From Swiss-Prot:
The lineage of its organism: Bacteria, Pseudomonadati, Pseudomonadota, Betaproteobacteria, Burkholderiales. Residues 5-73 form the J domain. HAMAP family: DnaJ. This is Chaperone protein DnaJ. CXXCXGXG motif repeats lie at residues 154-161, 171-178, 193-200, 207-214. GO terms for cellular component: cytoplasm. It comes from Cupriavidus necator (strain ATCC 17699 / DSM 428 / KCTC 22496 / NCIMB 10442 / H16 / Stanier 337).
């Protein structure tokens, strides 16, 4: 049967980053791991899927192997297709170029990098937790408690995975090595043991409570300290609080991804803040001092006379102190001149008189309006 494309196996594109490839592998490896799937037909399918995913990741996670695969496809990494790399390079050159792609395929000719002699340990998968906080909490820092998954040793089998009264035995197929050697022509390949799936151990009678995993899933509370100035989408890593490792491997990490709620007054742009502030017609025309809220209290700034709608004022240092830079950003106040509404007849008459007096002065009082009228006349003339 023809092998599937490695990128297709992991469900990523050919331009996927190393991090994306790693995340895809961890997700699929945990899904299809034999310890998580029952025996029988479904378990056999999961086992084949696990092997396929593992092989794809081994190729795409190594820069040299990935480059060979991208250029030549399976022929660049499959020993059964090695004839395509003959000629002046020969087998020695192929081994030198592709090093330890297959562990012990080329023995000492592959730079002396031989496969490991024991069960292969796998690092646990990382976990992600999404947290939503207010803009004020992001600006000043925050401490929160979160509930996350946790794995404890099974209290029925005390963590060894075997039903009480039975024992964990050394795998009779690989004799505890976790890997077996398979000869194909003049190649000797080292593969994961099909019986113990790389653990080196065999449990004839798995624990009825944890189903041979040795651990039970629970919940625990973690204290999370959010630094002042954290921005949207930033992540906080909690080392060792991810899923447990396999075959004695280290646990993964927990990543707390921070999201900031929309604020009724401020919009954030990096370390700067923006706000829209309505001002009266009289204040815009005559000027005055305006009071504006900030995340650290109130601030006052002068508005000059003849201020137009859309004018922006910058208040230095009234933004958010950057989590990386350590310096505060600025607050930008965008003023909008508000048109009076629901006027009385007396007020309307006063405005009409005011408007007539303004226009009697020509362009001196309304330069933009006069400029617009001149353009209109020119357009229709």
């Amino acid at each position: 049967m023809a092998k599937r494309d490695y990128y297709e196996v992991l469900g990523v594109g050919k331009n996927a980053s190393d991090d994306e490839i790693k995340k895809a592998y961890r997700k699929l490896a945990m899904k299809y791991h034999p310890d998580r799937n029952p025996e029988g037909k479904d378990g056999k399918i999961a086992e084949e899927k696990f092997k396929e995913v593992k092989e794809a990741y081994e190729m795409l996670s190594d820069p040299e192997k990935k480059a060979a695969y991208d250029q030549y496809g399976h022929a660049g990494v499959d020993p059964n297709m090695a004839g395509g790399f003959g000629g002046a390079q020969g087998y020695g050159g192929f081994a030198e170029a592709f090093g330890d792609i297959f562990g012990d395929i080329f023995g000492q000719q592959a730079g002396g990098r031989r496969g490991g002699g024991g069960p292969q340990a796998y690092r646990g998968a990382d976990l992600r937790y999404s947290m939503e906080i207010s803009l004020e909490q992001a600006a000043h820092g925050h401490e929160a408690q979160i509930r996350v998954p946790h794995w404890d040793d099974c209290d029925h089998c005390h963590g060894n995975g075997a039903e009480p009264g039975s024992s964990v035995e050394t795998c009779p197929t690989c004799h505890g090595a976790g890997q077996v050697r398979v000869s194909q022509g003049f190649f000797t390949m080292q593969q994961t043991c099909p019986k113990c799936h790389g653990s080196g151990k065999y449990i004839p009678k798995p624990c009825t409570k944890c189903h041979g995993q040795g651990k039970l899933k629970s919940q625990k509370t973690l204290e999370v300290k959010i630094p002042a100035g954290i921005d949207e989408g930033m992540r906080i890593r909690s080392s060792g609080n991810g899923e447990p490792g396999i075959n004695g491997g280290p646990p993964g990490d927990l990543y707390v991804e921070v999201h900031i709620k929309a604020h009724p007054m401020f919009e954030r742009d990096g370390d700067d803040l923006h706000c829209q502030m309505p001002i009266s017609f009289a204040t815009a025309a005559l000027g005055g001092d305006l009071e504006v809220p900030t995340l650290s209290g109130k601030a006052t700034f002068p508005v000059p006379e003849a201020t137009q709608s859309g004018k922006t004022f910058r208040l230095r240092g009234k933004g958010i102190k950057g989590v990386r830079s350590g310096y505060p950003g600025d607050l930008y106040v965008h003023v909008n001149v508000e048109t009076p509404v629901k006027l009385t007849e007396a007020q309307k008459e006063m405005l009409r008189q005011f408007d007539r007096s303004v226009h009697e002065g020509g362009s001196r009082h309304s330069p933009q309006e006069q400029s617009w009228l001149d353009k209109v006349k020119s357009f229709f003339s």
